[in-house]
């Protein structure tokens, strides 16, 4: 986080995120980013702080992961004046795609991207709402790199540092940034 970021804005963002105990299963503290979206001031502050962080860094595309990554990635791309690329679950993108599977806590999942969405000259910023294990973003980064895109940065509204996603993504050579952290799951 840069020193110029407004502490009041960061506090507003963190306070707007509701925590739901034992959802979706017992023992989980679910961080509900939809409550942030309901607060126009908090949502605007979120996008403004991302713009402050990433403006002027030469990105040519923002990639957002399904589905909440779209809610932060698309407005950020507009503010930066660059294109937005969605990474989606299988069968949701109409043109030719490539796919990357990844492990979930109990099973596997797959993400897809259009084969023509990223070019080798693209410098890509990956955006999602929450970083936990890092599996979704790792799969996203693999897709971008398979298409030749350059990706070294990933931005999140929330990070759960105890779960290990930051370390996992650092192992991929990513600079990880989150507006707020919550301890525990």
Swiss-Prot record:
NCBIfam families xref list: apt, PRK02304.1-1, PRK02304.1-3, PRK02304.1-5
Catalysed reaction, written as an equation: AMP + diphosphate = 5-phospho-alpha-D-ribose 1-diphosphate + adenine
Keyword terms: Cytoplasm, Glycosyltransferase, Purine salvage, Transferase
Pathway stated in the Swiss-Prot or TrEMBL entry: Purine metabolism; AMP biosynthesis via salvage pathway; AMP from adenine: step 1/1
Family: Belongs to the purine/pyrimidine phosphoribosyltransferase family.
Keyword DNA repair: no
Function per UniProt: Catalyzes a salvage reaction resulting in the formation of AMP, that is energically less costly than de novo synthesis.
Biological processes annotated in GO: adenine salvage; AMP salvage; purine ribonucleoside salvage
GO cellular component term, pick one: cytosol
EC number: 2.4.2.7
Subcellular location field: Cytoplasm
Organism from which the protein derives: Shewanella denitrificans (strain OS217 / ATCC BAA-1090 / DSM 15013)
HAMAP family named in the record: Aden_phosphoribosyltr (MF_00004)
InterPro entries in alphabetical order: Ade_phspho_trans, Adenine_PRTase, PRibTrfase_dom, PRTase-like
Chief localisation class: cytoplasm
Molecular function terms from GO: adenine phosphoribosyltransferase activity
Oligomeric and partner information: Homodimer.
Source organism superkingdom: Bacteria
Pfam families named among the record's database cross-references: Pribosyltran
Protein name listed in UniProt: Adenine phosphoribosyltransferase
């Amino acid at each position: 986080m840069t020193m110029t970021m407004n502490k009041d804005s960061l506090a507003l963002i963190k306070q707007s995120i509701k925590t739901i105990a034992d959802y979706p299963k017992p023992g989980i503290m679910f961080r509900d980013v939809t409550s942030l979206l309901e607060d126009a001031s908090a949502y605007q502050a979120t996008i403004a702080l991302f713009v402050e962080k990433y403006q002027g860094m030469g990105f040519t595309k923002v990639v957002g992961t399904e589905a909440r990554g779209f809610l932060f990635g698309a407005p950020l791309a507009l503010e930066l004046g660059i294109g937005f690329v969605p990474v989606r679950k299988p069968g949701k993108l109409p043109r030719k795609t490539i796919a990357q599977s990844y492990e979930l806590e109990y099973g596997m999942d797959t993400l897809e991207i259009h084969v023509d969405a990223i070019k080798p000259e693209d410098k890509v910023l990956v955006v999602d709402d929450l970083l936990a294990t890092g599996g979704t973003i790792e799969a996203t980064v693999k897709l971008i790199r398979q298409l030749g895109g350059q990706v070294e940065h990933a931005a999140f509204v929330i990070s759960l540092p105890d779960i290990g996603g930051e370390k996992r993504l650092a192992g991929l050579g990513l600079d990880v940034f989150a507006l707020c952290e919550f301890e525990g799951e």
